[in-house]
């Protein structure tokens, strides 16, 4: 889904999906605010969540659990990911001009928080 006003983008994203596909049984969003827009659009179009369409967010913010229909989400280690990215930038800045930064492959653990939208 596009970036910007997350709520509106989530809402408009459902409209675009309805135009492009006959049936959609699941929607994954990048942020809970997009998910809130998706849930609103689905409700207004008469779709039942999760019976007809499942919704999952990739951010895992607490707000998703506070909704009327609590949103399922993936809990990502954002602080750890941000710290590692900052460390890599600092290593690159501090490296000698003739040193290339090494390519690094990192895997971060996630946790599925199952709620009412799946």
Listing of model-derived features with the role each one plays in the protein:
Residues 2-20:
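Structural motif
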